[in-house]
Amino acid sequence: MSRYRGPRVKIVRRLGPLPGLTTKRRKLTEQNKLQDKKQKKSQYRIRLEEKQKLRFHYGLTERQLLRYIRIARKAKGSTGQTLLQLLEMRLDNTIFRLGMAATIRAARQLVNHGHIVLNERVVDIPSYRCKPNDKITIRDRDRSRILIEKNRTARSRLRIPGHLAMKQNTALITQVVDPKSIGLKVNELFIVEYYSRQA
């Protein structure tokens, strides 16, 4: 299954705010509120929607998400918490959380086009798993600097998470992310339950 490229507001309308997918918000009207109350959701649908939230927010394919579930299952500790840590420590998500891009999709494009330097090497793999003490900088090109500065100015009110430290154009990953501090309301246990028969 390929990555979703369709209308994003349609997804936000169905699943709620997804900051990694789009900056647009759902307009709350009285009719929307009534529709939300009317719908009775099955247990399967509740779990499916939680899984879809995660998939669309991080911009993953079904196969990629299943692979992360399998890795999380093998690790020690809570599968759901480990899954969120794996996804939060991806390079494209880290760029997004630093405010260098408006969405995770835009952050992925920055990485793919070689605008990001990780530990003094250009990295063009968005799924690269960042580790504590990794240093992220902007590539020493005018185009890269202008593009990222424009994004950071637009997102100047953004609060940088506790596991990241930012000084001018250099960011440092200080520790592994705490799953409670992710920028998305999601019930990871429902996602693990959804995949319990597949993975």
Curated annotation (Swiss-Prot):
Molecular-function GO terms, alphabetical: rRNA binding; structural constituent of ribosome
Residue intervals of the S4 RNA-binding domain: 89-151
Protein's cellular compartments: Plastid, Chloroplast
Main location: plastid
SMART domains: Ribosomal_S4, S4
GO biological process: one example: ribosomal small subunit biogenesis
CC per GO annotation: chloroplast; small ribosomal subunit
Alphabetized Pfam families for the sequence: Ribosomal_S4, S4
Highest taxon, organism lineage: Eukaryota
Keywords: Chloroplast, Plastid, Ribonucleoprotein, Ribosomal protein, RNA-binding, rRNA-binding
PANTHER family: 30S 40S RIBOSOMAL PROTEIN (PTHR11831), SMALL RIBOSOMAL SUBUNIT PROTEIN US4M (PTHR11831:SF4)
Subunit organization: Part of the 30S ribosomal subunit. Contacts protein S5. The interaction surface between S4 and S5 is involved in control of translational fidelity.
Function: One of the primary rRNA binding proteins, it binds directly to 16S rRNA where it nucleates assembly of the body of the 30S subunit. With S5 and S12 plays an important role in translational accuracy.
NCBIfam families, A to Z: PRK05327.1, rpsD_bact
Similarity field: Belongs to the universal ribosomal protein uS4 family.
Record-given protein name: Small ribosomal subunit protein uS4c
Organism: Zygnema circumcarinatum
